């Protein structure tokens, strides 16, 4: 572990030791003139899991700092949202924004991070739903078995001329048995649609698992 990563992880762990036991996710932050990073620090009752989760998150924070300090991208920001949490798992959407000087617009990259709070390991999508190919997802959207959401998580329809090109393993939990697959801008719609999501309900999850068993 390099010095920067070690300092970041130790700082995160140290901050969490000071918070009360009822806190589950708190916000860490770092800033500079055109750098504004806000990222999750996850607290669990299992020290090893806590360190593993926050070390993994630290990698994404370090990526953002590398974009700013080493790649000299004009502006970099990061924020997050906890989409679901229970005693076993925590689901987080971590979004990194970057803007090159002179570009028409900035770009975002959103990662769904679903962690087992007991082991500290990432939980793979196939633990919840089995998907064979992109055609299944595309057909599911067009038959309304699956839902299409824009960046504000507003239900819509996949735009004309766009289709699902690949099966992503990028996902988040939404609670009540719902799961969203996460696609970046321009992957399932124009830039104005932002980050887009393919939504699975418990009913569509059962259907896909039965179909692909």
Question: Model segments located where?
Answer:
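Bacterial N-terminal signal peptides that target proteins for export
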Residues: 1-8
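Bacterial N-terminal signal peptides
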Residues: 11-18
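Compositionally biased intrinsically disordered regions enriched in Thr/Gly
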Residues: 21-213
